[in-house]
Amino acid sequence: MAARLLLLGILLLLLPLPVPAPCHTAARSECKRSHKFVPGAWLAGEGVDVTSLRRSGSFPVDTQRFLRPDGTCTLCENALQEGTLQRLPLALTNWRAQGSGCQRHVTRAKVSSTEAVARDAARSIRNDWKVGLDVTPKPTSNVHVSVAGSHSQAANFAAQKTHQDQYSFSTDTVECRFYSFHVVHTPPLHPDFKRALGDLPHHFNASTQPAYLRLISNYGTHFIRAVELGGRISALTALRTCELALEGLTDNEVEDCLTVEAQVNIGIHGSISAEAKACEEKKKKHKMTASFHQTYRERHSEVVGGHHTSINDLLFGIQAGPEQYSAWVNSLPGSPGLVDYTLEPLHVLLDSQDPRREALRRALSQYLTDRARWRDCSRPCPPGRQKSPRDPCQCVCHGSAVTTQDCCPRQRGLAQLEVTFIQAWGLWGDWFTATDAYVKLFFGGQELRTSTVWDNNNPIWSVRLDFGDVLLATGGPLRLQVWDQDSGRDDDLLGTCDQAPKSGSHEVRCNLNHGHLKFRYHARCLPHLGGGTCLDYVPQMLLGEPPGNRSGAVW
Protein backbone atom coordinates (compact mmCIF):
# COMPACT_ATOMS: atom_id res chain seq x y z
CA MET A 1 0.00 0.00 0.00
CA ALA A 2 2.81 2.39 0.90
CA ALA A 3 4.55 1.54 -2.36
CA ARG A 4 1.38 2.40 -4.30
CA LEU A 5 1.04 5.72 -2.53
CA LEU A 6 4.69 6.51 -3.24
CA LEU A 7 4.23 5.65 -6.93
CA LEU A 8 1.08 7.79 -7.10
CA GLY A 9 2.96 10.69 -5.51
CA ILE A 10 5.77 10.42 -8.07
CA LEU A 11 3.24 10.37 -10.94
CA LEU A 12 1.53 13.47 -9.59
CA LEU A 13 4.86 15.27 -9.44
CA LEU A 14 5.49 14.38 -13.09
CA LEU A 15 2.16 15.83 -14.23
CA PRO A 16 2.33 19.40 -15.62
CA LEU A 17 1.15 22.11 -13.29
CA PRO A 18 -2.30 23.53 -14.15
CA VAL A 19 -2.10 26.71 -16.19
CA PRO A 20 -3.72 29.56 -14.28
CA ALA A 21 -6.67 31.21 -16.03
CA PRO A 22 -5.55 34.52 -17.59
CA CYS A 23 -8.69 36.35 -16.48
CA HIS A 24 -10.23 36.98 -13.07
CA THR A 25 -13.08 38.93 -11.53
CA ALA A 26 -11.73 42.17 -10.11
CA ALA A 27 -13.15 44.27 -7.30
CA ARG A 28 -14.71 47.69 -7.81
CA SER A 29 -11.57 49.53 -6.65
CA GLU A 30 -9.34 47.68 -9.12
CA CYS A 31 -11.80 48.14 -11.98
CA LYS A 32 -11.73 51.93 -11.56
CA ARG A 33 -8.04 52.05 -12.35
CA SER A 34 -7.02 53.11 -15.81
CA HIS A 35 -6.81 49.75 -17.56
CA LYS A 36 -6.95 49.42 -21.33
CA PHE A 37 -9.21 46.93 -23.07
CA VAL A 38 -7.68 43.67 -24.32
CA PRO A 39 -6.21 44.25 -27.81
CA GLY A 40 -8.77 43.93 -30.58
CA ALA A 41 -11.75 43.83 -28.23
CA TRP A 42 -13.73 46.00 -30.65
CA LEU A 43 -13.38 43.47 -33.49
CA ALA A 44 -15.80 40.91 -32.02
CA GLY A 45 -19.40 41.99 -32.32
CA GLU A 46 -18.75 44.21 -35.36
CA GLY A 47 -20.97 43.94 -38.41
CA VAL A 48 -19.70 42.33 -41.63
CA ASP A 49 -21.11 42.09 -45.15
CA VAL A 50 -20.37 38.46 -46.04
CA THR A 51 -20.44 39.17 -49.79
CA SER A 52 -17.69 41.79 -49.66
CA LEU A 53 -16.03 40.60 -46.42
CA ARG A 54 -15.99 44.28 -45.49
CA ARG A 55 -16.30 45.20 -41.83
CA SER A 56 -19.08 47.73 -41.54
CA GLY A 57 -17.53 49.91 -38.83
CA SER A 58 -20.86 49.68 -36.99
CA PHE A 59 -21.44 47.50 -33.96
CA PRO A 60 -24.60 45.48 -33.34
CA VAL A 61 -23.00 44.23 -30.09
CA ASP A 62 -21.96 46.66 -27.33
CA THR A 63 -18.28 45.96 -26.61
CA GLN A 64 -17.69 49.15 -24.59
CA ARG A 65 -19.38 48.15 -21.32
CA PHE A 66 -17.13 46.31 -18.87
CA LEU A 67 -18.60 47.03 -15.39
CA ARG A 68 -21.19 44.72 -13.88
CA PRO A 69 -24.07 46.18 -11.82
CA ASP A 70 -22.14 45.43 -8.62
CA GLY A 71 -19.11 47.38 -9.89
CA THR A 72 -16.92 44.35 -10.55
CA CYS A 73 -15.29 43.61 -13.89
CA THR A 74 -13.12 41.03 -15.63
CA LEU A 75 -9.40 41.76 -15.95
CA CYS A 76 -7.06 39.61 -18.02
CA GLU A 77 -3.31 39.26 -17.70
CA ASN A 78 -1.76 39.66 -21.15
CA ALA A 79 1.42 37.58 -21.23
CA LEU A 80 2.22 39.01 -24.66
CA GLN A 81 2.40 42.52 -23.19
CA GLU A 82 4.51 41.88 -20.09
CA GLY A 83 1.61 40.63 -17.99
CA THR A 84 -0.35 43.88 -18.22
CA LEU A 85 -3.86 43.70 -16.75
CA GLN A 86 -6.48 44.61 -19.35
CA ARG A 87 -10.26 44.96 -19.32
CA LEU A 88 -12.52 42.39 -20.96
CA PRO A 89 -15.88 43.79 -22.15
CA LEU A 90 -18.99 42.15 -20.73
CA ALA A 91 -19.93 41.00 -24.24
CA LEU A 92 -16.80 38.82 -24.53
CA THR A 93 -15.68 35.57 -22.93
CA ASN A 94 -13.00 32.87 -23.15
CA TRP A 95 -10.20 35.33 -23.84
CA ARG A 96 -6.81 33.70 -24.44
CA ALA A 97 -3.38 35.00 -25.40
CA GLN A 98 -1.95 32.31 -27.67
CA GLY A 99 1.74 31.56 -27.83
CA SER A 100 1.88 30.35 -31.42
CA GLY A 101 2.61 33.80 -32.82
CA CYS A 102 4.17 33.89 -36.28
CA GLN A 103 5.75 31.13 -38.28
CA ARG A 104 8.39 32.33 -40.72
CA HIS A 105 6.81 30.40 -43.55
CA VAL A 106 4.99 31.45 -46.71
CA THR A 107 2.05 29.29 -47.80
CA ARG A 108 0.90 29.28 -51.40
CA ALA A 109 -2.48 28.62 -52.95
CA LYS A 110 -3.06 28.33 -56.69
CA VAL A 111 -6.45 29.02 -58.24
CA SER A 112 -7.60 29.30 -61.84
CA SER A 113 -10.92 31.15 -61.68
CA THR A 114 -12.57 34.15 -60.10
CA GLU A 115 -14.97 32.05 -58.03
CA ALA A 116 -11.98 30.13 -56.64
CA VAL A 117 -10.41 33.46 -55.64
CA ALA A 118 -13.68 34.36 -53.88
CA ARG A 119 -13.67 31.03 -52.03
CA ASP A 120 -10.06 31.57 -50.99
CA ALA A 121 -10.87 35.09 -49.77
CA ALA A 122 -13.71 33.69 -47.63
CA ARG A 123 -11.65 30.89 -46.06
CA SER A 124 -11.19 33.05 -42.93
CA ILE A 125 -14.84 32.34 -42.09
CA ARG A 126 -14.65 29.23 -39.91
CA ASN A 127 -18.31 28.28 -39.74
CA ASP A 128 -21.35 27.90 -41.97
CA TRP A 129 -22.54 31.48 -42.32
CA LYS A 130 -25.71 30.36 -44.17
CA VAL A 131 -27.32 28.65 -41.15
CA GLY A 132 -30.83 30.04 -40.65
CA LEU A 133 -30.90 31.82 -44.02
CA ASP A 134 -32.51 30.90 -47.34
CA VAL A 135 -29.81 31.69 -49.88
CA THR A 136 -30.80 30.08 -53.18
CA PRO A 137 -29.33 32.05 -56.10
CA LYS A 138 -30.23 30.89 -59.63
CA PRO A 139 -30.40 27.16 -58.94
CA THR A 140 -29.14 25.09 -61.89
CA SER A 141 -26.67 22.25 -62.27
CA ASN A 142 -24.54 24.02 -64.87
CA VAL A 143 -23.85 27.18 -62.90
CA HIS A 144 -21.07 27.88 -60.41
CA VAL A 145 -22.40 30.23 -57.72
CA SER A 146 -20.42 32.34 -55.25
CA VAL A 147 -21.83 34.39 -52.39
CA ALA A 148 -19.28 34.70 -49.56
CA GLY A 149 -16.39 36.82 -50.78
CA SER A 150 -17.97 37.27 -54.21
CA HIS A 151 -17.65 41.08 -53.99
CA SER A 152 -14.41 41.11 -52.00
CA GLN A 153 -11.49 43.21 -53.20
CA ALA A 154 -9.60 40.06 -54.21
CA ALA A 155 -12.55 38.68 -56.21
CA ASN A 156 -13.15 42.03 -57.93
CA PHE A 157 -9.44 42.16 -58.84
CA ALA A 158 -9.60 38.66 -60.32
CA ALA A 159 -12.87 39.36 -62.17
CA GLN A 160 -11.39 42.47 -63.75
CA LYS A 161 -8.33 40.52 -64.87
CA THR A 162 -10.22 37.56 -66.34
CA HIS A 163 -12.21 39.94 -68.54
CA GLN A 164 -8.93 41.31 -69.91
CA ASP A 165 -7.02 38.11 -70.67
CA GLN A 166 -6.47 34.47 -69.77
CA TYR A 167 -5.05 34.37 -66.23
CA SER A 168 -4.16 32.03 -63.42
CA PHE A 169 -3.83 33.27 -59.85
CA SER A 170 -1.42 32.53 -57.04
CA THR A 171 -1.70 33.68 -53.43
CA ASP A 172 1.29 33.88 -51.08
CA THR A 173 0.30 34.22 -47.43
CA VAL A 174 1.93 34.65 -44.02
CA GLU A 175 -0.28 34.38 -40.92
CA CYS A 176 0.22 35.08 -37.22
CA ARG A 177 -2.17 34.31 -34.36
CA PHE A 178 -1.96 35.87 -30.89
CA TYR A 179 -5.42 36.13 -29.28
CA SER A 180 -8.77 34.36 -29.32
CA PHE A 181 -12.14 35.04 -27.68
CA HIS A 182 -15.81 35.07 -28.56
CA VAL A 183 -19.05 36.89 -27.91
CA VAL A 184 -21.27 35.62 -25.08
CA HIS A 185 -24.39 33.67 -26.00
CA THR A 186 -26.78 36.59 -25.38
CA PRO A 187 -24.69 39.73 -25.82
CA PRO A 188 -25.73 43.27 -24.90
CA LEU A 189 -26.80 45.21 -27.97
CA HIS A 190 -25.30 48.55 -28.91
CA PRO A 191 -27.73 51.44 -28.24
CA ASP A 192 -27.48 52.64 -31.85
CA PHE A 193 -28.32 49.16 -33.15
CA LYS A 194 -31.29 48.99 -30.79
CA ARG A 195 -32.59 52.28 -32.16
CA ALA A 196 -32.07 51.08 -35.75
CA LEU A 197 -34.04 47.92 -34.99
CA GLY A 198 -36.79 49.97 -33.40
CA ASP A 199 -37.22 51.93 -36.63
CA LEU A 200 -37.79 48.77 -38.71
CA PRO A 201 -41.31 47.88 -39.86
CA HIS A 202 -42.62 44.63 -38.40
CA HIS A 203 -42.89 42.92 -41.79
CA PHE A 204 -40.65 42.60 -44.86
CA ASN A 205 -42.20 43.25 -48.25
CA ALA A 206 -41.62 45.40 -51.32
CA SER A 207 -42.71 48.60 -49.57
CA THR A 208 -40.59 48.00 -46.44
CA GLN A 209 -37.55 46.67 -48.29
CA PRO A 210 -35.71 50.05 -48.38
CA ALA A 211 -35.76 50.29 -44.58
CA TYR A 212 -34.24 46.84 -44.22
CA LEU A 213 -31.64 47.50 -46.93
CA ARG A 214 -30.66 50.67 -45.06
CA LEU A 215 -29.96 48.61 -41.94
CA ILE A 216 -27.94 46.08 -43.98
CA SER A 217 -26.00 48.89 -45.64
CA ASN A 218 -25.06 50.31 -42.23
CA TYR A 219 -24.41 47.12 -40.27
CA GLY A 220 -23.74 44.40 -42.84
CA THR A 221 -25.35 40.98 -43.01
CA HIS A 222 -23.68 39.25 -40.03
CA PHE A 223 -21.88 40.02 -36.80
CA ILE A 224 -18.58 38.52 -35.69
CA ARG A 225 -19.21 35.86 -33.04
CA ALA A 226 -15.72 34.39 -32.40
CA VAL A 227 -12.27 35.61 -33.41
CA GLU A 228 -8.64 34.65 -33.77
CA LEU A 229 -6.58 37.83 -33.86
CA GLY A 230 -3.10 38.46 -35.14
CA GLY A 231 -1.89 39.40 -38.59
CA ARG A 232 -1.97 38.30 -42.18
CA ILE A 233 -0.03 39.33 -45.25
CA SER A 234 -1.44 38.12 -48.56
CA ALA A 235 -0.35 38.83 -52.11
CA LEU A 236 -2.61 37.69 -54.96
CA THR A 237 -0.59 37.64 -58.19
CA ALA A 238 -2.29 37.44 -61.59
CA LEU A 239 -0.26 35.61 -64.25
CA ARG A 240 -1.06 35.81 -67.97
CA THR A 241 -1.03 32.10 -68.81
CA CYS A 242 -0.34 32.43 -72.54
CA GLU A 243 2.28 35.15 -72.21
CA LEU A 244 4.20 32.80 -69.91
CA ALA A 245 3.90 29.99 -72.47
CA LEU A 246 5.42 32.23 -75.14
CA GLU A 247 8.32 32.98 -72.80
CA GLY A 248 8.92 29.28 -72.27
CA LEU A 249 7.74 29.37 -68.65
CA THR A 250 4.88 27.72 -66.80
CA ASP A 251 2.77 29.37 -64.13
CA ASN A 252 4.05 26.79 -61.62
CA GLU A 253 7.66 27.83 -62.25
CA VAL A 254 6.85 31.51 -61.74
CA GLU A 255 4.74 30.80 -58.64
CA ASP A 256 7.57 28.76 -57.10
CA CYS A 257 10.02 31.62 -57.57
CA LEU A 258 7.55 34.21 -56.26
CA THR A 259 7.22 32.16 -53.07
CA VAL A 260 11.01 31.92 -52.77
CA GLU A 261 11.37 35.70 -53.12
CA ALA A 262 8.60 36.24 -50.54
CA GLN A 263 10.40 33.95 -48.10
CA VAL A 264 13.64 35.89 -48.57
CA ASN A 265 11.78 39.14 -47.82
CA ILE A 266 10.59 37.80 -44.46
CA GLY A 267 14.05 36.59 -43.50
CA ILE A 268 14.19 32.94 -44.66
CA HIS A 269 17.47 32.14 -46.40
CA GLY A 270 19.27 28.95 -45.45
CA SER A 271 16.48 26.40 -45.97
CA ILE A 272 15.63 27.68 -49.46
CA SER A 273 19.12 28.20 -50.88
CA ALA A 274 18.67 25.46 -53.52
CA GLU A 275 15.32 26.89 -54.65
CA ALA A 276 16.74 30.42 -54.76
CA LYS A 277 19.66 29.21 -56.90
CA ALA A 278 17.26 27.48 -59.31
CA CYS A 279 15.29 30.71 -59.68
CA GLU A 280 18.47 32.67 -60.42
CA GLU A 281 19.27 30.14 -63.16
CA LYS A 282 15.80 30.63 -64.65
CA LYS A 283 16.31 34.39 -64.70
CA LYS A 284 19.56 33.95 -66.63
CA LYS A 285 18.03 31.44 -69.04
CA HIS A 286 15.12 33.73 -69.87
CA LYS A 287 17.24 36.90 -69.83
CA MET A 288 15.23 38.49 -67.03
CA THR A 289 16.80 41.72 -65.78
CA ALA A 290 14.54 42.06 -62.71
CA SER A 291 13.24 39.79 -59.97
CA PHE A 292 10.22 37.57 -60.58
CA HIS A 293 7.96 39.74 -58.40
CA GLN A 294 9.04 42.86 -60.29
CA THR A 295 8.58 41.19 -63.69
CA TYR A 296 5.17 39.74 -62.81
CA ARG A 297 3.65 42.58 -60.84
CA GLU A 298 -0.09 42.42 -61.55
CA ARG A 299 -0.94 41.99 -57.91
CA HIS A 300 -3.48 42.69 -55.18
CA SER A 301 -1.92 42.88 -51.71
CA GLU A 302 -3.54 43.04 -48.29
CA VAL A 303 -2.02 43.47 -44.84
CA VAL A 304 -4.24 42.75 -41.82
CA GLY A 305 -3.19 43.93 -38.38
CA GLY A 306 -0.09 45.71 -37.12
CA HIS A 307 1.52 48.98 -38.16
CA HIS A 308 2.14 49.10 -41.91
CA THR A 309 0.80 52.42 -43.15
CA SER A 310 3.97 53.19 -45.12
CA ILE A 311 4.25 49.72 -46.71
CA ASN A 312 1.18 48.15 -48.31
CA ASP A 313 2.99 45.04 -49.56
CA LEU A 314 5.28 43.39 -47.01
CA LEU A 315 6.07 40.44 -49.30
CA PHE A 316 6.85 42.06 -52.64
CA GLY A 317 6.85 45.83 -52.08
CA ILE A 318 9.82 48.03 -52.97
CA GLN A 319 10.62 48.56 -49.28
CA ALA A 320 9.81 44.99 -48.21
CA GLY A 321 12.50 43.13 -46.28
CA PRO A 322 13.24 41.19 -43.07
CA GLU A 323 13.52 44.36 -40.95
CA GLN A 324 10.15 45.69 -42.09
CA TYR A 325 8.56 42.26 -41.58
CA SER A 326 9.98 41.93 -38.05
CA ALA A 327 8.78 45.43 -37.15
CA TRP A 328 5.28 44.51 -38.35
CA VAL A 329 5.29 41.26 -36.35
CA ASN A 330 6.42 43.10 -33.21
CA SER A 331 3.50 45.53 -33.57
CA LEU A 332 0.85 42.79 -33.77
CA PRO A 333 0.36 42.01 -30.03
CA GLY A 334 -0.66 45.62 -29.44
CA SER A 335 -2.54 46.12 -32.70
CA PRO A 336 -3.92 42.79 -33.91
CA GLY A 337 -6.18 42.29 -36.89
CA LEU A 338 -8.89 39.80 -37.77
CA VAL A 339 -7.36 36.54 -39.02
CA ASP A 340 -10.08 33.89 -38.56
CA TYR A 341 -13.62 34.33 -37.33
CA THR A 342 -17.11 32.90 -37.16
CA LEU A 343 -20.21 34.77 -38.27
CA GLU A 344 -23.88 34.75 -37.33
CA PRO A 345 -26.64 36.57 -39.23
CA LEU A 346 -27.94 39.75 -37.63
CA HIS A 347 -31.48 38.47 -37.13
CA VAL A 348 -30.38 36.06 -34.34
CA LEU A 349 -29.75 39.09 -32.12
CA LEU A 350 -33.50 39.79 -31.98
CA ASP A 351 -35.84 38.07 -29.56
CA SER A 352 -37.48 34.98 -31.04
CA GLN A 353 -40.93 36.50 -30.36
CA ASP A 354 -40.12 39.74 -32.20
CA PRO A 355 -41.78 39.72 -35.66
CA ARG A 356 -38.87 41.78 -37.00
CA ARG A 357 -36.56 38.79 -36.43
CA GLU A 358 -38.27 36.82 -39.23
CA ALA A 359 -38.59 39.95 -41.37
CA LEU A 360 -34.86 40.67 -41.04
CA ARG A 361 -34.05 37.03 -41.80
CA ARG A 362 -36.03 37.27 -45.04
CA ALA A 363 -34.41 40.61 -45.93
CA LEU A 364 -30.93 39.17 -45.38
CA SER A 365 -31.76 36.09 -47.46
CA GLN A 366 -33.05 38.23 -50.31
CA TYR A 367 -30.07 40.58 -50.20
CA LEU A 368 -27.56 37.71 -50.28
CA THR A 369 -29.38 35.95 -53.10
CA ASP A 370 -29.38 39.15 -55.14
CA ARG A 371 -25.67 39.72 -54.49
CA ALA A 372 -24.62 36.25 -55.63
CA ARG A 373 -22.35 35.98 -58.63
CA TRP A 374 -22.34 33.02 -60.96
CA ARG A 375 -20.66 31.60 -64.03
CA ASP A 376 -22.78 29.87 -66.65
CA CYS A 377 -21.03 26.61 -67.44
CA SER A 378 -23.59 25.50 -70.05
CA ARG A 379 -22.25 27.84 -72.72
CA PRO A 380 -20.34 25.97 -75.45
CA CYS A 381 -16.59 26.34 -75.80
CA PRO A 382 -15.14 28.29 -78.74
CA PRO A 383 -14.22 26.27 -81.85
CA GLY A 384 -11.19 24.07 -81.26
CA ARG A 385 -11.76 23.83 -77.51
CA GLN A 386 -13.62 21.38 -75.29
CA LYS A 387 -14.91 21.20 -71.73
CA SER A 388 -12.38 20.22 -69.11
CA PRO A 389 -13.26 16.85 -67.52
CA ARG A 390 -12.25 18.31 -64.14
CA ASP A 391 -14.15 21.60 -64.41
CA PRO A 392 -17.15 22.04 -66.74
CA CYS A 393 -16.68 25.80 -66.55
CA GLN A 394 -13.20 25.58 -68.09
CA CYS A 395 -12.46 25.13 -71.79
CA VAL A 396 -9.26 23.31 -72.73
CA CYS A 397 -7.45 22.26 -75.90
CA HIS A 398 -5.80 19.11 -77.14
CA GLY A 399 -2.11 19.83 -76.70
CA SER A 400 -0.31 19.93 -80.05
CA ALA A 401 2.98 20.97 -81.57
CA VAL A 402 1.75 24.57 -81.76
CA THR A 403 -0.62 24.95 -78.78
CA THR A 404 -0.64 23.94 -75.12
CA GLN A 405 -3.56 22.33 -73.27
CA ASP A 406 -4.35 25.83 -72.00
CA CYS A 407 -4.94 26.80 -75.66
CA CYS A 408 -1.84 28.99 -75.72
CA PRO A 409 0.53 29.24 -78.69
CA ARG A 410 3.90 27.67 -77.97
CA GLN A 411 5.87 30.37 -79.80
CA ARG A 412 5.51 33.75 -81.41
CA GLY A 413 4.87 34.13 -85.14
CA LEU A 414 2.32 31.32 -85.44
CA ALA A 415 -0.57 31.82 -87.85
CA GLN A 416 -3.04 29.88 -89.96
CA LEU A 417 -2.33 30.58 -93.63
CA GLU A 418 -4.59 29.83 -96.58
CA VAL A 419 -4.92 30.97 -100.18
CA THR A 420 -8.56 31.49 -101.05
CA PHE A 421 -8.69 32.57 -104.72
CA ILE A 422 -6.36 32.44 -107.74
CA GLN A 423 -6.88 33.97 -111.18
CA ALA A 424 -4.54 34.17 -114.17
CA TRP A 425 -5.01 35.86 -117.51
CA GLY A 426 -3.09 36.37 -120.72
CA LEU A 427 -1.24 33.09 -120.30
CA TRP A 428 0.77 31.72 -123.19
CA GLY A 429 2.00 28.18 -122.79
CA ASP A 430 1.40 26.36 -126.11
CA TRP A 431 1.89 27.37 -129.75
CA PHE A 432 -1.22 25.85 -131.19
CA THR A 433 -3.64 25.41 -128.24
CA ALA A 434 -4.66 27.35 -125.13
CA THR A 435 -2.83 26.81 -121.86
CA ASP A 436 -3.43 23.79 -119.62
CA ALA A 437 -2.65 25.69 -116.40
CA TYR A 438 -2.11 24.69 -112.79
CA VAL A 439 -0.49 26.48 -109.84
CA LYS A 440 2.06 25.27 -107.30
CA LEU A 441 2.15 27.02 -103.92
CA PHE A 442 5.09 26.93 -101.48
CA PHE A 443 5.51 28.08 -97.89
CA GLY A 444 7.53 26.89 -94.90
CA GLY A 445 8.66 23.67 -96.56
CA GLN A 446 5.14 22.77 -97.72
CA GLU A 447 3.99 22.43 -101.32
CA LEU A 448 0.35 22.58 -102.43
CA ARG A 449 -1.09 22.35 -105.94
CA THR A 450 -4.29 23.29 -107.71
CA SER A 451 -6.10 21.18 -110.23
CA THR A 452 -5.42 21.74 -113.93
CA VAL A 453 -7.69 24.01 -115.93
CA TRP A 454 -7.55 22.66 -119.45
CA ASP A 455 -7.32 24.68 -122.63
CA ASN A 456 -7.84 28.13 -121.03
CA ASN A 457 -5.52 31.15 -121.10
CA ASN A 458 -7.59 32.92 -118.41
CA PRO A 459 -8.15 30.29 -115.74
CA ILE A 460 -9.77 30.82 -112.33
CA TRP A 461 -9.33 28.57 -109.28
CA SER A 462 -12.04 29.19 -106.65
CA VAL A 463 -10.54 26.87 -104.07
CA ARG A 464 -9.15 27.06 -100.54
CA LEU A 465 -5.59 25.85 -100.19
CA ASP A 466 -4.71 25.60 -96.51
CA PHE A 467 -1.13 25.55 -95.22
CA GLY A 468 -2.40 25.10 -91.65
CA ASP A 469 -0.34 26.46 -88.76
CA VAL A 470 2.84 28.15 -89.97
CA LEU A 471 5.55 30.49 -88.70
CA LEU A 472 4.62 33.60 -90.61
CA ALA A 473 7.83 35.56 -90.05
CA THR A 474 10.36 32.84 -90.79
CA GLY A 475 8.58 30.49 -93.21
CA GLY A 476 9.97 32.32 -96.21
CA PRO A 477 7.99 33.99 -98.98
CA LEU A 478 4.62 32.70 -100.04
CA ARG A 479 5.51 31.51 -103.56
CA LEU A 480 3.06 30.80 -106.37
CA GLN A 481 4.24 29.26 -109.65
CA VAL A 482 2.00 28.99 -112.71
CA TRP A 483 2.72 25.99 -114.93
CA ASP A 484 1.53 24.76 -118.31
CA GLN A 485 0.98 21.02 -118.17
CA ASP A 486 2.33 18.97 -121.03
CA SER A 487 3.29 15.36 -120.46
CA GLY A 488 4.11 15.92 -116.77
CA ARG A 489 7.89 15.69 -117.14
CA ASP A 490 8.38 18.65 -119.43
CA ASP A 491 5.77 21.06 -118.01
CA ASP A 492 6.56 24.70 -118.68
CA LEU A 493 6.98 27.29 -115.89
CA LEU A 494 5.09 30.41 -116.96
CA GLY A 495 6.18 32.57 -114.04
CA THR A 496 6.70 32.94 -110.28
CA CYS A 497 5.17 35.33 -107.78
CA ASP A 498 6.72 35.80 -104.30
CA GLN A 499 4.98 37.58 -101.46
CA ALA A 500 6.06 38.06 -97.81
CA PRO A 501 2.77 37.25 -96.05
CA LYS A 502 1.28 39.51 -93.41
CA SER A 503 -1.59 38.88 -91.05
CA GLY A 504 -5.04 39.69 -92.37
CA SER A 505 -6.71 39.31 -95.77
CA HIS A 506 -4.77 40.52 -98.81
CA GLU A 507 -4.99 40.53 -102.60
CA VAL A 508 -1.76 40.28 -104.60
CA ARG A 509 -1.12 40.96 -108.31
CA CYS A 510 1.98 39.82 -110.18
CA ASN A 511 3.32 39.96 -113.71
CA LEU A 512 4.49 36.57 -114.96
CA ASN A 513 6.91 35.76 -117.76
CA HIS A 514 3.93 34.79 -119.88
CA GLY A 515 0.83 36.42 -118.42
CA HIS A 516 -0.53 37.86 -115.20
CA LEU A 517 -1.59 36.47 -111.82
CA LYS A 518 -3.91 37.60 -109.03
CA PHE A 519 -4.55 35.74 -105.77
CA ARG A 520 -6.02 36.32 -102.34
CA TYR A 521 -4.66 34.92 -99.11
CA HIS A 522 -5.63 35.10 -95.45
CA ALA A 523 -3.22 34.80 -92.50
CA ARG A 524 -4.87 34.63 -89.08
CA CYS A 525 -2.63 34.89 -86.03
CA LEU A 526 -3.21 32.22 -83.41
CA PRO A 527 -5.04 33.44 -80.28
CA HIS A 528 -2.95 35.75 -78.08
CA LEU A 529 -0.75 36.76 -81.04
CA GLY A 530 -0.91 39.86 -83.22
CA GLY A 531 1.03 42.27 -85.39
CA GLY A 532 2.03 41.99 -89.04
CA THR A 533 3.90 38.72 -88.54
CA CYS A 534 2.13 37.58 -85.34
CA LEU A 535 5.15 38.27 -83.14
CA ASP A 536 3.28 40.51 -80.68
CA TYR A 537 1.44 39.29 -77.59
CA VAL A 538 -2.23 40.31 -77.65
CA PRO A 539 -4.59 39.81 -74.66
CA GLN A 540 -7.74 37.80 -75.35
CA MET A 541 -10.64 39.68 -73.79
CA LEU A 542 -13.67 37.77 -72.57
CA LEU A 543 -16.96 38.44 -74.27
CA GLY A 544 -20.01 38.99 -72.14
CA GLU A 545 -21.05 41.10 -69.20
CA PRO A 546 -18.17 42.91 -67.48
CA PRO A 547 -17.61 42.42 -63.76
CA GLY A 548 -18.99 44.76 -61.13
CA ASN A 549 -22.73 44.40 -61.69
CA ARG A 550 -24.30 44.75 -58.25
CA SER A 551 -27.00 42.12 -58.63
CA GLY A 552 -25.86 38.79 -59.97
CA ALA A 553 -22.82 39.75 -61.99
CA VAL A 554 -21.75 36.98 -64.34
CA TRP A 555 -18.16 35.79 -64.24
Swiss-Prot record:
N-glycosylated. Ca(2+) 5 binds at residues 486, 491. The keyword S-adenosyl-L-methionine does not apply. The record marks 214, 344 as: Important for oligomerization. Its cofactor is Ca(2+). GO terms for cellular component: cytolytic granule; cytolytic granule lumen; cytosol; endosome lumen; extracellular region; immunological synapse; membrane; plasma membrane. GO terms for biological process: apoptotic process; cellular defense response; defense response to tumor cell; defense response to virus; granzyme-mediated programmed cell death signaling pathway; immune response to tumor cell; immunological synapse formation; killing of cells of another organism. Residues 1-21 form the signal peptide. The chain crosses the membrane at residues 129-149, 257-279. Ca(2+) 1 binds at residues 429-430, 484, 486, 492. Residues 397-519 form the C2 domain. Glycans are attached at residues 205, 549. Ca(2+) 2 binds at residues 430, 433-434, 436. GO terms for molecular function: calcium ion binding; identical protein binding; pore-forming activity; wide pore channel activity. It is found in: Cytolytic granule; Secreted; Cell membrane; Endosome lumen. Keywords: Calcium, Cell membrane, Cytolysis, Disease variant, Disulfide bond, EGF-like domain, Endosome, Familial hemophagocytic lymphohistiocytosis, Glycoprotein, Lysosome, Membrane, Metal-binding, Secreted, Signal, Transmembrane, Transmembrane beta strand. Ca(2+) 3 binds at residues 430, 436, 484, 486. Perforin consists of three domains: (1) the MACPF domain, which includes the central machinery of pore formation, (2) the EGF-like domain, which forms a 'shelf-like' assembly connecting the MACPF and C2 domains, and (3) the C2 domain, which mediates calcium-dependent binding to lipid membranes. Monomer, as soluble protein. Homooligomer; homooligomerizes to form a pore-forming ring. This is Perforin-1.
